[in-house]
Each structure stands twice: as structure tokens, then as C-alpha cells.
A protein has these predicted regions:
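Inter-lobe coupling linker of SF2 helicases/translocases
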Residues: 1-16
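Catalytic core of IPPT-family isopentenyl/dimethylallyl transferases
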Residues: 13-130
Length: 130
């Protein structure tokens, strides 16, 4: 469509009224989110991220393509080039993911003001009512 998601969202007409929806934004407590991010980075490495990046590299995708900019690719490539250790890969992936989560949170705060913000426990209790 060559339109940004923002343009598409704002210009697409819905068959539903806003009152037909109960909008929920899942907001993890910061310390829980940080722990989940770090655990996820460790799990990615444990489950074969290095091999996956090697396979990706064999596809010869240009560095300016979006896929080459995914979190983890640059960090694992630094490891493959022996510039950093595997623990540093995990830390760098965690940092970039935290930065991405912060951008998402900032965006949500400005664009989802009328949504119902719930932490996972509140959401679980809310959904039990249905």
C-alpha cells in the first residue's frame, strides 16, 4: 500500500462503532518486563540464535534491508567475528530490546490513552469474568 501503519489505521473505515470494543493495553511492571527481556535473550541464544544468524548470513541479504536490522543479528555477527563474547551478545540483545520496549511504552502512553491499562494479573482476573 506504500502507506505507513499510522496512515492506514487513520484512513481505514471500520464496520464497528468504538463502543463495540473494550480496548486493553497490557502493561507489565518494569522489573518483570526487564527480567522477561533478559530471560528471552538467554533463551534465544540457548535455542540456536547463532546458527540461525549463520543461515541468515548465507542468504546474502543486504545490510540495508529491514531483516538485517532485527535485534540480535548485529550482536550475533559481532560474536561470529570474535569481537565479543556470548555473554556480551546476551547483554547487548537485552539492552536493545529494553530500548525497543521503552519506545513502545512511550508510543502507547501517547496513542492509547483511552485504552484500559492492565498488568497481567489484572488482565487474568478480568478475563475470568467472561
Amino acid at each position: 500500500t506504500k502507506k505507513s501503519i499510522y496512515e492506514w489505521f487513520n484512513n481505514t473505515k471500520s464496520n464497528y462503532q468504538h463502543k463495540d470494543f473494550y480496548k486493553i493495553y497490557i502493561d507489565f511492571p518494569k522489573n518483570e518486563l526487564l527480567n522477561r527481556i533478559h530471560s528471552r535473550a538467554r533463551e534465544m541464544i540457548k535455542k540456536g540464535a547463532v546458527l540461525e544468524v549463520k543461515k541468515f548470513n548465507s542468504l546474502k541479504v543486504r545490510n540495508d534491508k529491514t531483516a538485517s536490522k532485527a535485534i540480535g543479528i548485529t550482536e550475533v555477527n559481532e560474536y561470529l567475528l570474535k569481537k565479543i563474547e556470548i555473554d556480551q551478545v546476551i547483554e547487548k540483545i537485552s539492552i536493545k530490546t529494553r530500548q525497543y520496549a521503552k519506545r513502545q511504552s512511550t508510543w502507547a502512553r501517547g496513542n492509547m490513552q483511552n485504552w484500559n491499562k492492565k498488568n497481567p494479573i489484572q488482565l487474568k482476573n478480568f478475563l475470568k469474568k467472561f
